């Protein structure tokens, strides 16, 4: 059974930068989990990409769909392989284009969808308090072409009565957002994507990530929450297998439950007890 994660975001939303940062962090190991690209050439590409980022060079935006094959392990014991399908920003602007149709099919075939939102969308230049900030950003997002295209994609999928996979909404560059307004960001996303989030049977998680600052010469990465979107995605895949294993009374159910619990620990910083 194939495992697939599809990643979508507007141009320059930070998808490529996030991928490189996530890969370097996870390949080094986080909570005894480690990630590696199965293709050595992809590993080399991501390593070189991270080197450029660390030197203050911003990566070029993705201009075509890219697929990576990753392997995740715990204490060097295999957990799973999965495909990471990254689509270029702006692809939803042409719904009838073959690339857009391929995207829709990949969403339908995916175990998890990561929707990347550019943290710059949430930067205010005028707000003096939380209410002013929320009203300003809600208006800005309402008229953002990229966000509207994403909302329309969900509308088209719903017209086909398609059940969406778990969705992770990821705000990149969250260091640009004042700490006092971070909770308002969650509210803004919930209102913007209300029809997506308020369906009780749908699994949607909101996350904020950053590499720790603007990518300029001399940039020193200080990643925050960089592992959580990938942990959420892997957890969604494990849940798929757990349901199947329990239905078939498969002995692997205990194995899956063990790793599901371990991966859930990635979220303890976001949701402290």
What are these regions (language model features)?
Residues 101-200:
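Conserved C-terminal guanine-recognition region of P-loop GTPase G domains, centered on the G4
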Residues 59-114, 120-129:
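Switch II of P-loop NTPase G domains
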Residues 8, 38, 87, 117-119, ...:
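A short hydrophobic beta-strand->loop->alpha-helix junction that borders the nucleotide-binding pocket
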Residues 2-7, 27, 31, 162, ...:
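C-terminal non-catalytic interaction/localization modules
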Residues 1-69, 73-82:
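Conserved G1/Walker A P-loop phosphate-binding module
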Residues 14-15, 91-93, 123-125, 176-179, ...:
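Short catalytic/ligand-binding loop motif for oxyanion handling, primarily in non-cytosolic enzymes
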Residues 4, 168, 175-242:
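Canonical P-loop GTPase G-domain recognition
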Residues 6, 17-25, 109, 149-153, ...:
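Alpha-helical scaffold elements adjacent to nucleotide-binding pockets in ATP/GTP-utilizing enzyme cores
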């Amino acid at each position: 059974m194939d495992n697939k994660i599809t990643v979508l975001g507007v141009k320059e939303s930070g998808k490529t930068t996030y991928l490189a940062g996530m890969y370097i962090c996870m390949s080094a190991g986080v909570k005894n989990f480690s990630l590696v690209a199965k293709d050595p050439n992809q590993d080399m590409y991501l390593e070189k990409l991270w080197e450029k980022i660390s030197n203050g060079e911003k990566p070029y935006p993705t201009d075509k769909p890219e697929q990576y094959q990753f392997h995740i392990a715990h204490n060097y014991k295999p957990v799973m392989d999965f495909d990471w399908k990254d689509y270029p920003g702006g692809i939803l602007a042409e719904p009838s284009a073959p690339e857009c149709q391929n995207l829709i099919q990949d969403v339908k075939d995916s175990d998890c969808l990561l929707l990347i939102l550019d943290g710059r969308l949430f930067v205010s230049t005028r707000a003096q308090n939380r209410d002013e900030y929320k009203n300003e950003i809600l208006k800005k997002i309402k008229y953002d072409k990229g966000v509207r295209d994403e909302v329309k994609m969900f509308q088209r999928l719903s017209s086909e009565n398609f059940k969406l996979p778990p969705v992770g909404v990821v705000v990149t560059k969250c260091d640009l957002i004042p700490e006092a307004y971070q909770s308002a960001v969650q509210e803004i996303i919930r209102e913007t994507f209300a029809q997506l989030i308020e369906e009780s049977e749908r699994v949607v998680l909101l996350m904020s990530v950053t590499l720790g600052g603007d990518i300029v010469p001399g940039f020193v990465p200080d990643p925050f929450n960089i592992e959580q979107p990938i942990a959420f995605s892997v957890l969604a895949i494990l849940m798929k297998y757990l349901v199947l294993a329990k239905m078939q009374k498969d002995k692997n159910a205990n194995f899956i439950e063990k790793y599901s619990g371990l991966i859930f620990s990635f979220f303890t910083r976001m949701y402290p007890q």
